[in-house]
Amino acid sequence: MATSLSKILTRSNTKRYWCSTTTSISASPSLPKQFWSRHFSAVADSSSSSSAALGSQSSSSAPPQENKRGSKWSQLLLFLPGAITFGLGSWQIVRREEKFKTLEYQQQRLNMEPIKLNIDHPLDKNLNALEFRRVSCKGVFDEQRSIYLGPRSRSISGITENGFFVITPLMPIPGDLDSMQSPILVNRGWVPRSWREKSQESAEAEFIANQSTKAKSPSNEPKSWWKFWSKTPVITKEHISAVKPVEVVGVIRGGENPSIFVPSNDPSTGQWFYVDVPAMARAVGLPENTIYVEDVHEHVDRSRPYPVPKDINTLIRSKVMPQDHLNYSITWYSLSAAVTFMAYKRLKAKPVRR
């Protein structure tokens, strides 16, 4: 449009100039005709060049609107990484507050008085209400069917020692109302490798002695319902004098979720690398729905006789603690500030040098 207007104006100006010039030629016939022809051609060339320059200037001064839209979107995309990292930092702050509430809830539950699992508090009715509650279980350990979970290491005075967690069935005491009404599995704590070897030797010797005694004097005692699941007889009144009853204070726990780097359990060879409660219960001849309890103590003395139970404070620890969430949030916020600053510097107009 601007180009056509410039051409029209140029033509009108040229015509006016021609008219005025022809009038001047007629008025002054002394100048030759060759001079006026050269003069007219120069004027025409200058007018055409000026119109072309005007058209190009008008076309370059008006960029397409699509380029403006594209530049706005590209500018917004530069700030997108900063917005994402800022959101991740805020999410870590929220997770930190949630972790504080979870750990506080667990601490309050663990500080409550232990619940006695006896005839008044059967296990099958209170499992959902016993989350992170200490329970008191009275019974007799069946040492011959202990399971060793490991290897597990512990550090004492900077020295690392390998060992195992020993898991033993705790059997009810017949006729005792304070005793449990069904057997459970108890994680009694950590033992060294040498303790495991000695325990297995003594268990084998005791098993042979029991088999010989059983062959000489068969028992006519009535069988309990869990006798059908058990590989060895249930504890009877005659065994109570030889085996001392114990009372375990622990917390009901579930199985573990192993990572891809943990080997699979092999019950046939007695190799257990992670807690699988149903499989362990089957291995010792108990029902698959047997309860698994971890023996816990406050302020555990590491020099006490084996097994060494778990410290109760380990139950209120998590793989990611609140301090870790705070560190993650600081990292994300720092990254957000860095990428936002780089985007600002990229869009900031540079001063023109003269």
Curated annotation (Swiss-Prot):
Family: Belongs to the SURF1 (TC 3.D.4.8) family.
Name of the coding gene: SURF1
Cellular component aspect of the GO annotation: mitochondrial inner membrane; mitochondrion
Principal subcellular localisation of the protein: mitochondrion
GO biological process, one term: embryo development ending in seed dormancy
Keywords: Membrane, Mitochondrion, Mitochondrion inner membrane, Transmembrane, Transmembrane helix
Location in the cell: Mitochondrion inner membrane
CDD domains: SURF1
Protein name stated in the entry: Surfeit locus protein 1
Annotated function: Probably involved in the biogenesis of the COX complex.
Taxonomic source organism: Arabidopsis thaliana (Mouse-ear cress)
Membrane topology: Multi-pass membrane protein
TM annotation in the entry: 76-92, 328-344
